[in-house]
Structure formats: C-alpha cells, structure tokens
C-alpha cells in the first residue's frame, strides 16, 4: 500500500517540499535562514492577530489601546514585545539570507532571486506601516518624513503624497489605511513565499561550492528537519531573551510619548533595520537624488545577476571577491551606525563616503574582481 503522504493530493505537496525533497549533502547553517524566516512570519501573523483584537486604529485612541494591551490584557505585554522584537529578528534573518545568496551566488536562480527581492520590499513596507500604528512621536514623524519623500517625484509628487495621507497631513485616514495594509500584507508575503519556494524547488538548492550537486543528494527529512529545529530553538531563545530581558533595547524612547503634530523630535529616525538606507538618503543634499539613491540601495539587488562576471558561481574559492564582500558588510554596518547619528560633522562626511563605497563596491569593484579572478585562473 502506498504511504498516505505520497498519495493524498495535499500531503503529496507537503511531502515533496519538506520530506522527500532531495537536498545537497553539504549545505551549511547559512541555509537555515529560509526556514527561520518562515517561522518568523508565522509568529508575526499570530502575535499580530492577537494585537489586532485589542488595537483601535484611531488617532485619539491608538496610543491608549497599545498601553491598554501592555497593562490590562493577559500577557498582552509579551505579545506586544514579541511582535515588535520579532520584526527585528525577522530582519536579521532576512539580511543574513540575502547575504548568503550574495556570497554563494544563489542569485543565478533568477526567478527565485527576483521574487526574493519583491519579498524584501514588501516586508520593508509592512514593517514601516506597523511602526506607525502605536501612534507615538517617532511613529507620527517617521510616517510624515518617509511618506513626504514621495513629494520629490516631479509633477505628481504632491498629489501622490496627499493621496497616500488621505488629507493634507498624516492623520486618522492615514492611520486607518496603514492598519488595513499592515494587516493584509503579511498574507501577501505568505503567498509570495510559497511562490519563492515553488521556483526554488524547480532548480533545487544551491550549495557552498556553487557546483551542481545532483550526484550527491540526501532526503530533507530527517537530516535538514532536525537541523532546522536546532535553528528554530536558537531563534526562539534569542527572541524570548530579547522580549523578556530587554524589550525596549531596539525601540525608540520617543515612541513612549503620544504623537504630537506641533512638536518635532530632535532626531527623526526609523527602526534600526532601515538605518542603512536612511543614511544613504541623508548623504545626498538633493531631495530627489536622495530618494533615488534610497530606492536604488534596495533595487540594486535585482541587478546583481547581471553584474556577475566570474566563471565561478560561489565566492568560496575567490579570495579577492571575499575581501570585497566583507568590506560591503562592514560598509553596511557603518551606514547603519551613521543613520542613527545626528546630521553634523563628522557623521555627514562618513555617511557620504560609506554611501559612495556601497554603490562602488557593488557596481564596479566586485564585477572587476570577478574579471581579475578569471584571468588568475589561466595564469
């Protein structure tokens, strides 16, 4: 008799994706982050659902409703802080997942990579709108500053901003629509993640060497299920430690002050995971130029497959490109630090140098390094 997991129409899909899937025998812990992102997404949807049961998307009561969740709802504070810190863990996993793809040349799976870039953009949009919902000072001013950037678009800019706001400033209409979008987008992300997996399973996983591994495959279960469970345990330990011991470590103190349109905070900045892009935006003195650089800092990922010049897929055997890759990581950490600093000397010039270096590394230095390494192969 055929096993039910191989014959039942629904079980068969799950079986082919998570049980009998042929996987390379040598994929390292850097390949754990896909499953961790899935866990993060489920966790965010569940905690978000329970928060939405008590939250009111209204300018007069939003801040109070979040306070009510933390003070009066049974374990409401745990749910609220798991959701807020869950977003930070989500982005740590996202950036690591993208970094892994860059390092090992996984971007040569074009469809999977492009869906991944769309997933990243959608997740960033969702996180931004979620940050507005508690209606604290940084929520309000963050929303005002970031949405106002669209006014830099020639001709339609101002109309576009007022259309997004639903009025002449960030107000009740903005909060209501942001709540609606923040609620629906995670389900869009889930659908995109399924498509992402679908495309990945068309080609099979990449591996650290970048060499086809068809000759040496092992079943996903039990080898990688047990490996994923270890990753999930470490993820949950990190999240719970953060939530229970330092829930406000990654937040902004200004968000404990209710939103006040008449008082601007001294330093407006987004959540830490957007600081690198915010630093690039601020490093250009022209508004439209800054907005374009901001958009390009993320969209440049879609160009990566076209910038691949090496005959080898992975960076595993390419020391020159490895040095440039880690220089890029250091540069991104520098940009993240600068994004959280005030706009004054010496931070302005550091931000400008780091921004130029970011684009220079991706667009020029890494492709050139690939060509040099090709020459060294013949040497």
Curated annotation (Swiss-Prot):
Transmembrane segments: 33-53, 77-98, 113-133, 178-198, 226-246, 288-308, 320-340, 347-367
UniProt binding sites for heme b b566: 97, 196
Membrane topology value: Multi-pass membrane protein
SUPFAM superfamilies reported in the protein's UniProt record: a domain/subunit of cytochrome bc1 complex (Ubiquinol-cytochrome c reductase), Transmembrane di-heme cytochromes
Cofactor note: Binds 2 heme b groups non-covalently.
UniProt-listed InterPro entries: Cyt_b/b6_C, Cyt_b/b6_C_sf, Cyt_b/b6_N, Cytb/b6-like_sf, Cytochrome_b, Cytochrome_b_C_euk/bac, Cytochrome_b_N_euk/bac, Di-haem_cyt_TM
Cellular localization per UniProt: Mitochondrion inner membrane
Alphabetized Pfam families for the sequence: Cytochrom_B_C, Cytochrome_B
Binding site for heme b b562: 83, 182
Signal peptide: none
Keywords from the UniProt entry: Electron transport, Heme, Iron, Membrane, Metal-binding, Mitochondrion, Mitochondrion inner membrane, Respiratory chain, Transmembrane, Transmembrane helix, Transport, Ubiquinone
Family: Belongs to the cytochrome b family.
Protein name: Cytochrome b
Organism expressing this protein natively: Hippopotamus amphibius
Gene: MT-CYB
């Amino acid at each position: 008799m055929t096993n039910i997991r191989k014959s039942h129409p629904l079980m068969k899909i799950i079986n082919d994706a998570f049980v009998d899937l042929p996987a390379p025998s040598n994929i390292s812990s850097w390949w754990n982050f896909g499953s961790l992102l899935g866990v993060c997404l489920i966790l965010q949807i569940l905690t978000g659902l329970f928060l939405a049961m008590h939250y009111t998307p209204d300018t007069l009561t939003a801040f109070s409703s979040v306070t009510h969740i933390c003070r009066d709802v049974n374990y409401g504070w745990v749910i609220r802080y798991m959701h807020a810190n869950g977003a930070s863990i989500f982005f740590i996993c996202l950036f690591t997942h993208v970094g892994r793809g860059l390092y090992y040349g996984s971007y040569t799976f074009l469809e999977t990579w492009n869906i991944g870039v769309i997933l990243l953009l959608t997740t960033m949009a969702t996180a931004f709108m979620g940050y507005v919902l508690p209606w604290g000072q940084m929520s309000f001013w963050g929303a005002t500053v970031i949405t106002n950037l669209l006014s830099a678009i020639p001709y339609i800019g101002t109309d576009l901003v007022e259309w997004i706001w639903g009025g002449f400033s960030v107000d009740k209409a903005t909060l209501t629509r942001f709540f609606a979008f923040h609620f629906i987008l995670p389900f869009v992300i889930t659908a995109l993640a399924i498509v992402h997996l679908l495309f990945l399973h068309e080609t099979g996983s990449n591996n650290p060497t970048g060499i086809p591994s068809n000759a040496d495959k092992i079943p996903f279960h039990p080898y990688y299920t047990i490996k994923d469970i270890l990753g999930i345990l470490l993820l949950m330990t990190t999240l719970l430690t953060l939530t229970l011991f330092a829930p406000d470590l990654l937040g902004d103190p200004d968000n404990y002050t209710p939103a006040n349109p008449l008082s601007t905070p001294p330093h407006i900045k987004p959540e830490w995971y957007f600081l690198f892009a915010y630093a690039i935006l601020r490093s250009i003195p022209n508004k439209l130029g800054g907005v374009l650089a901001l958009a390009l800092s993320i969209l440049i990922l879609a160009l990566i497959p076209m910038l691949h010049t090496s005959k080898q897929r992975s960076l595993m055997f390419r020391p020159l490109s490895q040095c440039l890759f880690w220089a890029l990581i250091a540069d991104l950490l520098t940009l993240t630090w600068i994004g959280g600093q005030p706009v004054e000397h010496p931070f302005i010039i550091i931000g400008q140098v780091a921004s130029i270096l970011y684009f220079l590394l991706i667009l020029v230095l890494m492709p050139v390094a690939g060509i040099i390494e090709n020459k060294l192969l013949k040497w």
